[in-house]
């Protein structure tokens, strides 16, 4: 998001590590509101643009940002109850959805503008007649670029806190790992962008088995590297990434272990097929997810906030 805002000439403010959170969500998700570790040093290390500032609660209220984003169910309580009463006269309010939450998790009663990263949010915005943009995140195509075809048998997975957040899907992949001895599964649950890019570069593809749709970074980044993504057909149904998951190009769909084994063996054992899919994958995704086009749409969305 910082790169998209930078392209539009906007500054992004994020709560600093000394921001004292007052309003937490209800159990069982009340252990998290947002990342509370941001410092100036961390921003310089993690973010490539110069348009990001970490600020305290007092600074946010003093600056009065043009737009205040709720970025998830977990932090809507802090934003709406602690900040918005003091900013409602000067700022616009929007919700950036990056996980397909349940219907009542969204503050329909209060927020009119929605930046949707998942298909469920799009459908719900249509139902509640809200203003929305089905937005694709800015992808760093320079960092996640196609360098060369790869051989070998490494298959990567890049789902944060996989075993804790999605235990059933994690167990499914672990079972595949035990059944498919010809593959070297690399399950990365805490990797940095640099570590993710390195693993993708070394791998032949990615496996992404998850019932909940997120922002979509890992899937698109893998495709950008020329690493097709194995997707569980049933779990992928109705997800927004189906718009760029092209069978035998950017994605390989499977419904059970046998189908996964057949398709993964073909990818590993047939060099001509593997190299064709990897190269075409990296080309196709750049056509389907275009940073400049998405940023232009984001600019229009921000200019026309209700």
PLM feature segments, named:
Residues 17, 24-123:
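Extended catalytic core of nucleotide-activated donor transferases of GT-like folds
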Residues 112-145:
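Donor nucleotide-sugar binding/catalytic pocket of nucleotide-sugar-dependent glycosyltransferases
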Residues 137-193:
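Conserved catalytic-core segment of nucleotide-activated headgroup transferases in glycan assembly
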Residues 197, 220-224, 242-243:
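Short alpha-helical segment that forms part of, or immediately flanks, the ligand-binding pocket
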Residues 198-214, 227:
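Acidic donor-binding loop of glycosyltransferase active sites
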Residues 228-237:
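Short hydrophobic beta-strand element within catalytic cores of glycosyltransferases
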Residues 252, 256-273:
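C-terminal "capping" alpha-helix adjacent to the active site of nucleotide-linked donor transferases
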Residues 269-303:
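A charged, aromatic-enriched C-terminal amphipathic alpha-helix characteristic of glycosyltransferases
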């Amino acid at each position: 998001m910082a790169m998209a805002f930078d392209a539009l000439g906007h500054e992004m403010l994020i709560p600093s590590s000394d921001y004292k959170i007052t309003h937490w969500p209800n159990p069982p998700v009340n252990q998290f509101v947002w990342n509370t570790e941001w410092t100036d040093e961390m921003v310089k290390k993690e973010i490539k643009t110069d348009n990001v500032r970490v600020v305290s609660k007092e600074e946010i209220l003093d600056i009065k940002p043009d737009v205040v984003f709720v970025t998830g169910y977990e932090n809507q309580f802090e934003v709406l109850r602690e900040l918005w009463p003091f900013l409602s006269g000067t700022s616009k309010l929007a919700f950036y959805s990056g996980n397909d939450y349940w219907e009542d998790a969204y503050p329909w009663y209060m927020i009119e503008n929605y930046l949707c990263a998942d298909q469920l949010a799009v459908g719900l915005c249509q139902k509640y007649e809200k203003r929305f943009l089905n937005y694709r995140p800015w992808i760093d195509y320079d960092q996640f670029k196609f360098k060369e075809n790869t051989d070998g048998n490494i298959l990567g997975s890049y789902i944060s806190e996989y075993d804790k957040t999605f235990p059933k899907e994690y167990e499914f992949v672990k079972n595949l790992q035990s059944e498919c001895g010809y593959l070297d599964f690399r399950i990365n649950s805490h990797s940095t962008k640099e570590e993710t890019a390195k693993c993708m570069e070394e791998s032949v593809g990615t496996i992404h088995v998850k019932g909940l749709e997120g922002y979509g970074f890992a899937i698109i980044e893998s495709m950008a590297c020329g690493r097709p993504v194995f997707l569980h057909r049933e779990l992928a149904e109705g997800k927004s990434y189906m718009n760029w998951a092209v069978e035998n190009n950017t994605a390989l769909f499977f419904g059970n272990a046998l189908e996964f084994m057949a398709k993964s063996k073909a990818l590993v054992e047939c060099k001509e097929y593997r190299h064709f899919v990897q190269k075409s994958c990296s080309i196709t995704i750049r056509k389907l997810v275009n940073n400049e086009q998405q940023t232009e749409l984001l600019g229009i969305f921000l200019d026309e906030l209700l």
